[in-house]
Regions:
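Terminal low-complexity tails and localization/encapsulation signals of metabolic enzymes
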Residues: 252-264
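Conserved CoA-thioester-binding segment of acyl-CoA-metabolizing enzymes
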Residues: 1-56
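Glycine- (often His-adjacent) and acidic-residue-rich active-site loop
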Residues: 55-99, 226
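C-terminal long alpha-helix characteristic of the crotonase
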Residues: 21, 130-135, 177, 183-232, ...
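Glycine-rich phosphate-binding loop at the start of an alpha helix
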Residues: 63, 90, 94, 117, ...
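CoA-thioester-processing core
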Residues: 95-104, 110, 116-170, 183, ...
Length: 264
C-alpha cells in the first residue's frame, strides 16, 4: 500500500491515517487511490469490527491538491469520463468517500484542522464524525468552478437540510465546528477527537459484530435509497464543468489570488 495512507490495528479496531502532513493531507491521485485501497482491504477483514479515520499533522484533509487538476481534467475527457463506474456504483473519485459509507464495519472520523472539499466529502462517508472545536469546514469545489462530485450530493443530503446544502455549496464559504454540529455534519465536538473516536470504536467493537454490521446495512439501505442515480448525475455535472472556460478561470484566479472574471 502507498505510504500516503497507513493502517494500524488496536485490538479489533483499525486506525486509518491519511499521511501527507506536509500538504495537509491534500488529495492527489496517489492519495485518492490509497484511500480507496485501504477501504477495500478493510472490507474483507472479519477481524476488524470498527474503523477510525484520521489525518496526520495539522489537518484532517485540505481537499484536492490543485497540482492534480490536469489529471482530473484528463479523466473527465477520457473514454467514459466521470460517468464510467469503476468501483461498483461509483467512479474512483466518488469511491474515496463511498468506500467508507459502504464498508460493512462502522467508521468514525476524527477530524481536526481543516476538512475542505474532497476532505469534507471523505469525512461524510463515515458513520460518525467527531471534530475538534477549532476545525474549519468548506464545500470548496465552488471556489474552483466545480460541484461536489465525490459522493457529496448523496452524503450531505442524509445529514443536513436542503437549504443548508445549497448555501454552503453555492458560496464555498468556510464554516465553523459549531455550524457543522448545528447543521448535522458533525456528530459531536471534542478537544481530543482521535482519542474520543478510538474510545467509541472500542465500545462498538465490544458489541456483537453480526448485529452491528446488520444495523449499519439496514440504516444505509433505508437512508440512501436512490443514491446510485444521484452518483451518476453528480458525475455528469462535473464532467460538463471540468476544463471549461469559467472553470479554468476559477482555478487561475484562485492560484493568482485575484477576483475571477467569469463569462455569461
Amino acid at each position: 500500500m502507498s505510504d500516503r495512507v497507513t493502517i494500524t490495528q488496536e485490538d479489533q479496531v483499525a486506525i486509518v491515517t491519511l499521511s501527507r502532513p506536509e500538504k495537509r493531507n491534500a488529495l492527489d491521485l496517489e492519495m485518492i487511490e490509497a484511500i480507496v485501497a485501504a477501504g477495500q482491504e478493510l472490507a474483507k477483514r472479519k477481524d476488524i469490527r470498527a474503523v477510525v479515520l484520521t489525518g496526520d499533522g495539522e489537518a484532517f484533509c485540505a481537499g484536492l491538491d490543485l497540482a492534480a487538476m490536469p489529471l482530473i481534467a484528463q479523466a473527465a475527457m477520457s473514454d467514459g469520463g466521470f460517468t464510467q463506474r469503476t468501483h461498483g456504483n461509483s467512479n474512483l473519485f466518488q469511491a474515496v468517500a463511498m468506500v467508507w459509507a459502504e464498508l460493512p464495519q462502522p467508521v468514525i472520523a476524527a477530524v481536526h484542522g481543516f476538512s475542505f472539499g474532497g476532505g469534507f466529502q471523505l469525512m461524510l462517508g463515515a458513520d460518525i464524525r467527531i471534530a475538534d472545536p477549532n476545525t474549519k469546514f468548506s464545500v470548496m469545489e465552488g471556489r474552483w468552478g466545480l460541484v461536489p462530485d465525490m459522493g457529496g450530493m448523496v452524503l450531505m443530503r442524509r445529514l443536513a437540510r436542503e437549504d443548508v446544502i445549497r448555501k454552503i455549496t453555492y458560496t464555498a464559504q468556510v464554516f465553523s465546528s459549531d455550524d457543522a454540529l448545528a447543521w448535522g455534519f458533525v456528530t459531536e465536538l471534542s478537544a481530543a477527537p482521535l482519542e474520543a473516536a478510538k474510545a467509541l470504536a472500542q465500545e462498538i467493537a465490544g458489541k456483537s459484530p453480526d448485529a452491528v454490521r446488520s444495523a449499519k446495512k439496514l440504516i444505509s439501505d433505508t437512508e440512501l435509497t436512490g443514491w446510485h442515480e444521484t452518483l451518476i448525475e453528480e458525475s455528469k455535472a462535473q464532467e460538463a464543468l471540468v476544463g471549461q472556460k469559467n472553470q479554468m478561470e476559477a482555478v487561475m484566479a484562485g492560484m493568482q489570488k485575484r477576483p475571477a472574471k467569469y463569462s455569461d
